[in-house]
From Swiss-Prot:
Belongs to the milton family. This is Trafficking kinesin-binding protein 2. Its main location: cytoplasm. Residues 134-355, 502-519 form a coiled coil. O-glycosylated. Signal peptide: none annotated. Present in heart and brain (at protein level). GO terms for cellular component: axonal growth cone; cytoplasm; cytoplasmic vesicle; dendrite; dendrite cytoplasm; early endosome; mitochondrion; neuronal cell body. Residues 359-507 are annotated as: Interaction with HGS. Residues 688-704, 780-789 have a biased composition (Low complexity). Pfam families: HAP1_N, Milton. It comes from the Eukaryota. Interacts with RHOT1/Miro-1 and RHOT2/Miro-2. Interacts with GABA-A receptor and O-GlcNAc transferase. Interacts with HGS.
Amino acid sequence: MSLSQNAIFKSQTGEENLMSSNHRDSESITDVCSNEDLPEVELVNLLEEQLPQYKLRVDSLFLYENQDWSQSSHQQQDASETLSPVLAEETFRYMILGTDRVEQMTKTYNDIDMVTHLLAERDRDLELAARIGQALLKRNHVLSEQNESLEEQLGQAFDQVNQLQHELSKKEELLRIVSIASEESETDSSCSTPLRFNESFSLSQGLLQLDMMHEKLKELEEENMALRSKACHIKTETFTYEEKEQKLINDCVNELRETNAQMSRMTEELSGKSDELLRYQEEISSLLSQIVDLQHKLKEHVIEKEELRLHLQASKDAQRQLTMELHELQDRNMECLGMLHESQEEIKELRNKAGPSAHLCFSQAYGVFAGESLAAEIEGTMRKKLSLDEESVFKQKAQQKRVFDTVKVANDTRGRSVTFPVLLPIPGSNRSSVIMTAKPFESGVQQTEDKTLPNQGSSTEVPGNSHPRDPPGLPEDSDLATALHRLSLRRQNYLSEKQFFAEEWERKLQILAEQEEEVSSCEALTENLASFCTDQSETTELGSAGCLRGFMPEKLQIVKPLEGSQTLHHWQQLAQPNLGTILDPRPGVITKGFTQMPKDAVYHISDLEEDEEVGITFQVQQPLQLEQKPAPPPPVTGIFLPPMTSAGGPVSVATSNPGKCLSFTNSTFTFTTCRILHPSDITQVTPSSGFPSLSCGSSAGSASNTAVNSPAASYRLSIGESITNRRDSTITFSSTRSLAKLLQERGISAKVYHSPASENPLLQLRPKALATPSTPPNSPSQSPCSSPVPFEPRVHVSENFLASRPAETFLQEMYGLRPSRAPPDVGQLKMNLVDRLKRLGIARVVKTPVPRENGKSREAEMGLQKPDSAVYLNSGGSLLGGLRRNQSLPVMMGSFGAPVCTTSPKMGILKED
């Protein structure tokens, strides 16, 4: 037993030596005896993965040759102390080294993470093996301690047995000695001889010792056999324990391998689960982003839905409001039609009483003046007016109303036949004698139809004129043929629609017959609406007797057809809306009381750059020498007075018309005609007042109201009864509707321009005032004199009137140029004038005219005005700011009381040539 333990300890010591010498594989033969020359025990250590195998060599014949097998307990205790825990730990660490991890590391040496993982697993396995080895070492240590204690007990038992054997042998010897002594005494008593007794005693004692030695030998042999059997049993038990320990270690290693394999599989599964988890997280993040986007879209759709709902509600409200306004306008339209019906009936009655008055148009050539002169026409007209009684006055009014009816029907027909109105000159005169002396700006258009449009109206007078002239600007034969063809087409269109108008008028009369009670409360407006009546029979008669009057004039250019006068045609050309050059001097046009501006012209930064900053100059042909005859007799001179009726009595000629001597002067009375759209409707005719007078209040509080001293004023007395469109936002205080009246009722004021002509002492006596229209003769109320209204001029205005649409339109008509811009659409033309003026920044001053007493009439307010006054309308923001893109021209006929000029910072001071 002690030998095997010593061999194990020797082998472990040899393994430690081998490990300390660079782990060389070798065999170590260790003798268990003290003699090194006797290799009885050979220990062979196989450096393998398993535990070292030990081979014990013993002599089978003699069993052993020396007594070293039995060692003392002290030596065994010393041998047990040679095993240290460090040696045992190193031994176990060396034993758990295997090749499995080496193979794995060689397979995965390229993967750093896997190698690190295997190294970590190896460290954990080594730690586990070390802990198991430590546990086994502790168990082995306990077993070795138990073995040592058992060996000590066995030695003590051997000592006790030896001691007992020695005592037993001593006792046996004593017993033998006692027995021998007793036998000898017995023999002595039998009288034997002493010699023989002594020999026998020595012999028996020798035999007894021999027997004792044999017995002792047998006992020792038996004891040796028992010890040998016990040693073999201990050896077998040791081998059994070693086998169990090896099996346990193998089981631990196998379990470790299985555990490592399971851990590797679990690691792979964990990596797969981690990848799947990452994929799930990405899917979750994408789904969350989609959810956020869908929520954002949902919010946007909700907001859009709310906005659409609000828009729908606003549209419904606007539709309801427009429906209500439409019903209201329909009611007012029916009311106006009723009043129109009554007015037409009244006009028919007056016309039946008056009788034919066609001779007025042809009596103008029998005066003292030339047949084609304007003075002769005016003289004949005034003579007929003075010779007519009250019945002739009614006939004249009826005829003039028929003229307006003709123009109304022609305008309506042309408005339906032409989508966009072509700007034409006012017809009713002979060939044009107007020559353009300068072009203020270039519109960038080609002069393809030179002087075609201004002469379309004059071409209609060729058959009835026996003295045709050939002034500059005469159109060619092709242009005349084109103009005649256009006029014939328009005439045919008008005749084709005559029947439709008649049927439509009959239907309206039937509708208006039911509303006579409602119309009875609007008698004042009935007379104002009389000019809208459309008598088809009278229109046909007048169209046939007017020398090709089938020509449909421009909308709102309402003039009476005066035939055969160069001066009248020049008036019509001057009536075109070119207010930008109204301050420029013209040959043949003398403006009394007007002084020229200084030579040093003042320019502004806001003015547009032009080649020549001069206005459009007209050259008017001088009248014949027949017009410069001596003054007519006093009864003839009175024909220049229009028939005025006032409550205070007739107005004297000398006081009311100081500048009546027209035959001795070359004065030309200019009617500035323009056309403006009604703020609410473009489809209805909106004629302005024929002769709006200016009520100018003086500093002393007195007003000097004068009548019109124009030669053509006698033809225009009834034009003041024109009608303006009614709309729900306009309060009608009078039937006379001029541009100044319309702007004032809309709250738009104009600033009075202080021209250099105001330095004249005669002109300085007149205060600054605005043009306030007065009521017509048939109006029950009259408008008072308005006080000067403050005006706030616009700032940052960079537009010039010469670049505006009316000026360009005038140049197109005079030069026959093509328009440089595309014609505006109907939606743009329907824009309200008031909205345009408001958009341009015109100062808004709400001033409502106060109606006067009912006892007065317009003739009482008006008187003959001084001819030394001129009308100047600038292109500032007050009047023409909203007309620059409007090609329709409102009619403004008559003479104003004072030189009222509107100005703006953009026009500056015009330079004179």
